[in-house]
């Protein structure tokens, strides 16, 4: 009986994987996503925004399923473009159930790892002026600044990277941290707000 159940689960999983591949390919075509070689996607990616640009490099792995990363982050990977925003993802990068929202630009280098549930927003979404916020249907006063994550950086699970942030090459951001500013290369930062912990030797 256990073997029968195992075989049924395997067959259902294969069908589901095929459907996900078709779904993602249609999404990429519709949203004109530029894709490099050997992209691997586990689950379905959600994309929003018909303007702007999304570029995915070579040998990128994207997990977008509760089954792909069983550590408590069950949302799908989301690429959300506001206006002419840009999301650029370098080669040999991996991410799991992340949310990237760009009004300006999000640039992710080569060899970067984004842990489960990481959120990267280059926009405030709403104005800090309460008068402008009274009309929830307007984006008036919404501010945005580019985000840069340099090569080989590692962003720990549950972290949030806010507008204007720069994460230096090879630096590590501890889990559940909030970054709003510049993290130099070869350093470990953690906390809310994220603070310097130590250099990486």
Which residues does each predicted region cover?
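Short hydrophobic beta-strand segments in globular cytosolic domains
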Residues: 156, 162, 174, 179-180
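Short conserved catalytic/interaction loops centered on acidic-Pro-aromatic/His motifs
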Residues: 123-130, 167-170, 184-186
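A short, glycine- and basic residue-enriched loop/turn
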Residues: 146-147, 164-165, 180, 186
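Histidine/lysine/aspartate-rich catalytic loop segments that bind and position anionic ligands
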Residues: 109-141
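Conserved beta-strand positions that form and line the central face of beta-propeller blades
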Residues: 178, 188, 196
